[in-house]
């Protein structure tokens, strides 16, 4: 299976740690590519609608080839830290740019990893889950998993062996 991971974090912290644990389990049987929006030139969606009549966004920025990779994937893993009760701006930019290829993103397998600085029963995780639930319903996604983790210190998640084993197991069982 071809898996595209969109890393919504610009830092090399807990979100990346979670991604790496998932990859450790998934890499044996799957082809994996990581997209790092913070390293791309991305103009915000203008809402012009031209993309609905042509192939891709009129902006000649990095998301056009990036969205091709996402559209070609069998599975998309969205990984994000929590910023202001929502997903990171980096991840949201990529999601907004996917509007131009919405129908090509239908029927994908999807997973989410959300890492925040509040306990996992806090509203911030629920708000992010609801956004992804709405996208999943609209695009007929098969939501394989939604995982939320609490970690504030740089290496806190890595020290949580139960969480690391859980993420590795999810990857391995795909």
Task: Name each model-derived stretch.
Residues 1-79, 85-101, 143-147, 157-174:
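N-terminal beta1-alpha1-beta2 submodule of the flavodoxin-like/Rossmannoid cofactor-binding fold
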Residues 80-81, 137:
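Acidic, low-complexity intrinsically disordered regions
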Residues 151:
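Active-site rim beta-loop-alpha module in soluble metabolic enzymes
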Residues 122-125, 155-160:
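Short, solvent-exposed loop/turn segments at secondary-structure boundaries
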Residues 105-146:
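Short, glycine-/small-residue-rich phosphate/pyrophosphate-handling segment
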